[in-house]
C-alpha cells in the first residue's frame, strides 16, 4: 500500500480557501503553470470515463473585461439580496461582514486577476432529464470534481483561486466573447493568481461528529456504530 504524508495532504485539503482580497494582481501567471493544474484536473473521476470537461483559460484583458462585466451584472442583485437578508438577521456579525467585503472586492477587480479559468462541460444537465438513477446528480458529479482538483493543484503551486458562478446568468454573452458553443455548459469562473502572504489557516467549521450520522439520519453519536 502506498504511504502518503497525511500531515501535508491534510494541510493542502484544509487550507485551500476561497481567495479574493489576497489575489496578487501584479504578477503574471505562466501558462505552463496553469496547464499543470489542468493536467491534474483531468485525473478527477468522471462517470463512464466520458471526460466531458473542457477548460477555457482567459488571460486576454479585453475578454477578461467581458467576463467581469457579466459577473458584476449578476453580482449586483445577488449581493443586494444577501445584504438585506443579513441586515434582518445578523447585521453585526463580523465574519459575515468580512465575507461581504471580500466578495465586493472581487467583483470590483475581477478583470485585473491574471487568469480567469472557465471550466466547461460538453452537453447540458438537461441531457439527463428523464434519466433513471439520479442522472442529474451524476452529470454534475462527473465534472465538478475536476474543478476542485484544479483548485487544489493551484494551491499546491502557490496560486489562489475562488469558485464563482455569478457570471453564469449571462453565460451566453460570455460564451459569445469566448467562442463557446451553445452545446457546451459553463460551470464556473475560477479567478487564479499568485496569493499575497505566506499561507492560509483552517476555516471555522462544525465538528465532524455533529454532521456525521451513523446508520440513520441525525444519529450523530460517534459511539453509535
Listing of model-derived features with the role each one plays in the protein:
Residues 76-88, 178-202:
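A glycine-rich helix N-cap at a beta->alpha junction
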Residues 52-53, 113-116, 187:
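Short, surface-exposed beta-edge/turn micro-motifs
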Residues 40, 100-104, 174-177, 197-199:
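Glycine-rich, charged/polar anion/phosphate-binding loops
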Residues 2-4, 8, 15, 20, ...:
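C-terminal helix-cap and adjacent tail motif
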Residues 44-50:
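Glycine-rich phosphate/pyrophosphate-binding beta-alpha loops
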Residues 37-42, 117-176:
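Small-aliphatic-rich amphipathic alpha-helix that forms the alpha element of a beta-alpha
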Residues 57-143:
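Glycine/small-residue-rich phosphate/adenosyl-binding loop
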Residues 1-36, 40, 59, 66-69, ...:
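N-terminal accessory segments that position/regulate proteins before the catalytic core
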